[in-house]
């Protein structure tokens, strides 16, 4: 795509109002990508997860007038053909962990996958680039600390612990978010973006 390194007018803005999510992203990215965080009220869209993510990135880029990274997370139950999917946040708010388990009560298949989509838009009017991470697992009765979304009910394949029970370092290594951010990191390393310094200390 490009030979010369792209100079970004300012650090990438990661759009989130979720402190736990921000903490996790900071832990995974470290200092590899200069970014700041900002809570924006973007309309909640419906559609395919990747399309939703791209559209949110476009809207955010025009609001901040610069490069943005937005994230969308889905929890997809195979027995329900991928639902709740991108609507997991509302399902969780309305019916809680027990309700999520009850959705699968009539089904033998408790398998699910967690999916994370990051969309990077380098500025207003730029086509967003998406990075997708997936982790397969199953839905179980809630176990572990109850302070981060649906982590207590998702047990990744190959592990005896739910996301909530795992040490953060282990979760970040294998999670849908960790996998998507590894691709974001890779992209930044190969694209050689540099952030324009304005010399204001």
UniProtKB/Swiss-Prot annotation:
EC number: 3.6.1.66
Main enzyme class: hydrolase
Protein name: Inosine triphosphate pyrophosphatase
Cofactor comment: Binds 1 divalent metal cation per subunit; can use either Mg(2+) or Mn(2+).
Taxonomic lineage from the root: Eukaryota, Viridiplantae, Streptophyta, Embryophyta, Tracheophyta
Subunit and interaction comment: Homodimer.
Binding site for Mg(2+): 44
GO biological process, one term: nucleoside triphosphate catabolic process
Species, as recorded: Sorghum bicolor
């Amino acid at each position: 795509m490009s030979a010369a390194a792209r100079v970004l007018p300012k650090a990438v803005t990661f759009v989130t109002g979720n402190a736990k999510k921000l903490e996790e992203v900071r832990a995974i990215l470290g200092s590899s990508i200069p970014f700041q965080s900002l809570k924006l009220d973007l309309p909640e869209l419906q559609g395919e997860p990747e399309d939703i993510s791209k559209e949110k990135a476009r809207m955010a880029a025009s609001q901040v007038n610069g490069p943005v990274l937005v994230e969308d997370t889905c929890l997809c139950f195979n027995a329900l053909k991928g639902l709740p999917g991108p609507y997991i946040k509302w399902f969780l708010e309305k019916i809680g962990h027990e309700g999520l388990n009850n959705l699968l009560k009539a089904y033998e298949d408790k398998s699910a996958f967690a999916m994370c989509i990051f969309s990077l838009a380098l500025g207003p009017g730029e086509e967003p680039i998406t990075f997708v991470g997936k982790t397969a697992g199953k839905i179980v009765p809630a176990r572990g600390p109850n302070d981060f979304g649906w982590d207590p009910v998702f047990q990744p394949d190959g592990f005896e612990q739910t996301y909530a029970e795992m040490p953060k370092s282990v979760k970040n290594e294998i999670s849908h978010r960790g996998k998507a951010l590894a691709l974001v990191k890779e992209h930044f390393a190969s694209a050689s973006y540099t952030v324009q310094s304005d010399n204001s200390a």
